[in-house]
């Protein structure tokens, strides 16, 4: 799901691999899906606007693409663009879309201008262009960390808040090597320092060095951060700390959002996450996999989970479903 959402967002950057891959991509669990389009339906908020984006693609072509907008609490609503087959409608709020022809394999998201004079179009374009994605393999090589002093200090302070003694970092180019090396400065209790290269760090530290800059950028922009297997190789307390950054209004004044996958039940706790923030995935016998929020799940007694239940314990006991059948 996260990969699919990321590929939709990449359309705004001109990466149309989602569309071109539809020639060979379909749900292999059901042969009838071979004849159906890949369909996406996104609801999101940005700068006071509520947007709905719909996309259907099949065999390397866009069949239908729509963007609707509205302002909650007002009558301000309309269409940014609507496209079906060869019919195309561009709304007044879409701003100038600079194209003479629109190939079937190209998304209209590519032509939304983040610098548009239309606040509505600008909000929609910036949401897509600022989405970030952290994947499990991203920390296998040294990340491209910011060199600006202020950003560097923010990253190091967050690492120190997680009890990691990294005081600073530098990027050096060694003779005979094409790629620059990332060197971390560690502080010792006696006030002395020592230096460690990125490749010498533990897997957990390497993951945090790759993840935390994305967290900082997400909080600064108020953007969506997607993270696959966020809990892997991280201590549960570190995972909780990262979640707390998004839940604290002072640290997250621009309403950034974190959507992640995890197998760690330690965060399934009312003190950490609300019921509507927890989605479980299960595959009922004989049917396709389903994703459902804990806030709408009905237990055997017909009641939804209370907001004071020990979610993690109840989940492991099989009270909420979504456990593997072993």
Task: Give the ranges of each region predicted by the language model.
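Phosphate-binding glycine-rich loops of NTP-binding sites
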Residues: 1-26, 208-209, 214, 244-245, ...
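Short, hydrophobic/aromatic-rich segments at coil-to-beta transitions
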Residues: 33-42, 63
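Short beta-strand segments that buttress and anchor functional surface loops
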Residues: 40-45, 184-186
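Short, mixed charged/polar active-site loops
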Residues: 50-52, 75-78, 192-195, 288-289
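Electropositive, glycine-dotted interaction segments
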Residues: 51-175
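Conserved ABC ATPase signature
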Residues: 174-216, 220, 224-237
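C-terminal lobe/lid and adjacent interdomain/linker elements of RecA-like ASCE P-loop ATPase modules
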Residues: 240, 244-326
């Amino acid at each position: 799901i996260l990969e699919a959402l990321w590929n939709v967002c990449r359309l705004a950057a001109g990466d149309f691999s989602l569309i071109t891959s539809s020639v060979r991509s379909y749900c292999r669990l059901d042969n009838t899906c071979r004849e159906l389009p890949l369909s996406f339906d996104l609801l999101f908020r940005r700068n006071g606007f509520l947007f709905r984006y719909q996309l259907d693609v099949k065999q390397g072509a866009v069949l239908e693409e729509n963007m609707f907008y509205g302002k909650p609490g007002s009558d301000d609503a309309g269409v940014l663009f609507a496209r079906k087959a060869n019919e195309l409608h561009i709304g007044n709020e879409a701003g100038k879309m600079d194209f003479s022809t629109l190939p079937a394999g190209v998304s209209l998201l590519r032509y939304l201008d983040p610098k548009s004079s239309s606040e509505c179009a600008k909000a929609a374009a910036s949401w897509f262009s600022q989405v970030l994605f952290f994947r499990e393999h991203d920390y296998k090589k040294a990340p491209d960390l910011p060199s600006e002093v202020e950003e560097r200090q923010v990253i190091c302070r967050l690492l120190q808040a997680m009890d990691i003694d990294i005081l600073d970092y530098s990027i050096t180019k060694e003779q005979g090597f094409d790629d620059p090396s990332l060197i971390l400065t560690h502080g010792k209790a006696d006030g002395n320092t020592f230096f460690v290269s990125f490749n010498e760090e533990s897997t957990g530290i390497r993951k945090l060095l790759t993840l935390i800059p994305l967290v900082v950028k997400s909080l600064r922009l108020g953007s969506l951060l997607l993270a696959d297997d966020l809990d892997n190789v991280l201590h549960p307390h570190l995972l909780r700390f990262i979640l707390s950054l998004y839940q604290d209004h002072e640290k997250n004044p621009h309403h950034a959002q974190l959507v992640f996958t995890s197998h760690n039940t330690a965060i399934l706790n009312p003190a950490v996450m609300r019921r509507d923030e927890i989605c479980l995935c299960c595959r009922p016998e004989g049917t396709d996999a389903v994703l459902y929020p804990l806030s709408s799940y009905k237990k055997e007694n017909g009641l939804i989970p209370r907001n004071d239940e020990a979610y993690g314990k109840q989940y492991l006991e099989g009270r909420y479903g979504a456990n593997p059948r072993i």
